[in-house]
UniProtKB/Swiss-Prot annotation:
It comes from Narcissus aff. pseudonarcissus MK-2014 (Daffodil). This is Noroxomaritidine synthase 2. It is found in: Membrane. It catalyses: 4'-O-methylnorbelladine + reduced [NADPH--hemoprotein reductase] + O2 = (10bR,4aS)-noroxomaritidine + oxidized [NADPH--hemoprotein reductase] + 2 H2O + H(+); 4'-O-methylnorbelladine + reduced [NADPH--hemoprotein reductase] + O2 = (10bS,4aR)-noroxomaritidine + oxidized [NADPH--hemoprotein reductase] + 2 H2O + H(+). One of its GO terms (cellular component) is membrane. Belongs to the cytochrome P450 family. One of its GO terms (biological process) is lipid metabolic process. Pathway: Alkaloid biosynthesis. Coiled coil: none annotated. Cytochrome P450 that catalyzes an intramolecular para-para' C-C phenol coupling of 4'-O-methylnorbelladine in alkaloids biosynthesis, including haemanthamine- and crinamine-type alkaloids, promising anticancer agents. Catalyzes the formation of (10bR,4aS)-noroxomaritidine and (10bS,4aR)-noroxomaritidine from 4'-O-methylnorbelladine. It is an enzyme of class 1 (oxidoreductase). The chain crosses the membrane at residues 14-34. Keywords: Alkaloid metabolism, Heme, Iron, Membrane, Metal-binding, Monooxygenase, Oxidoreductase, Transmembrane, Transmembrane helix.
Amino acid sequence: MATSSSAWLMFSDHYPEILIAIACFLIFSLLLSARSSSEDSLPYNWPIFGMLPAIISNNQFNDFTTARLRKMGWTFIFKGPWLLDMDYIFTCDPSNINHMFNDNFENYPKGELGKVFDIFGNNIFNADGDLWHDHRKMAQTILWDGNYRTMQATFIRNKMDNALIPILDSAACKRKPVDLQDVLLRFTFDTSCFSVLAADPESLTMEFPPVPFSKAADQALDAALTRHITPRLIWKLKRFFNVGSERTLAVAWKVIDSYIYDKIAELKAKRKLVGKINSYDAVSFYMDNFNIHDDKFLRDNAFTYLLAQRNTQSLTMTWLFYALFENPKVELKILSELKSIVDESSERKFNDGFTLFDSNMIQSAIYLHAALCEALRIYPPVPFEIKDAHKADVLPSGHKVRAGEKILFSPYAMARMKGIWGDDCLEFKPERWITGNGTLKHEPAYKFFAFSAGPRICLGKELSFTQMKMVVATIIYNFHLQMVKGHVVEQSNSILMDMKHGLMVQVRKRSVM
């Protein structure tokens, strides 16, 4: 008995150290297993932890998910930690996406996921039901208005004239590399601020000034991603105690609110001073056409418009240029098309020897449009999205969905499935978007998901294409860009498909055409 008691006392003295050692061993084993997991198998479903260690230890979530979806026939069940309601259905099956966004649309509202993105407030992004219908009708009125579109096109042309071309020209003359992703993000931030708030922040200048709003917006989206992979109870506790990613979000939120509310106040003050002005920005539209003057309403909608325009357009153009660096023959075809357009155009615009493309000139740029579609297919700005099931359901793939269960679907993975896009799915091939008659080929939205699908399909799709074509055409026609030798292009693990290290390029002026 004495020996037994002594042994127990010895063990109890070292009990904490033993527990820590066991915990460290388990964590190390989990991470090692997760990293060595074969692409031909699902992540190991550990007791307590589920498959989460495989996600946490992987720095390329989109490729990790794609490999598993390919092996498992486009859909699989992801098991989260026990008792934390973190099980997901992962899918890239077009029939499942069509089911959620079209056939059974009402069963997959924003619902609880709106709380994850509460920084957007009560707007078209988070709304459901009648409120969403009201928001969508107002957004349609704004985005399809001729004056609004003309104002945007004019400002974009002026911004190219006064900022984009001078900066690229300076980089060419000085032989100084520039981060094209940063240039395009600044460009679209300036243009989106003008179209939404009638204000030009002038972030795209030779000095490349800090842009607190843009930094805060990126931090807010990263915090939202953290909420997705964190048990709801945990991130709510972090928010309550104001720590970690929730503290970062709170600080970013204040920066975002300060900027937008200040711009709304400036616009209202200007209107009060000079009376109603002929401005066709989104905020003025809400006040003039819908008699909505509530600052919170205007803030929520302004933030959504700003992010939608700034992020999706800039990232699409950035990835397009990366694809052109990898496929120079495609760039030559675009250049040839643009030369034909310029030769036939009576509306050629010059700026110190540079040619500017306006919204009329680029309407016939079919091959450029196809190249943008291909960039959106392979590099979707939003590589994955998540839906909540309101009621129990069965997906076309045969997978049962519990009420409240989350479904993650991946447009990024969809683009990489031979059964969806053919054996050449990994190739950057604009020709897949052009018919035998030389017209653009239509693909159903649940297959080409860059602009969403069903009743929630993006209202600004054609406007976005027009604006991107103006910018890309002007850059390609006037400059030859090359990626800096040795520069590494890597996706960020983010809600958005941005480049972790940017896109560093050398710029040369093209010879006179």
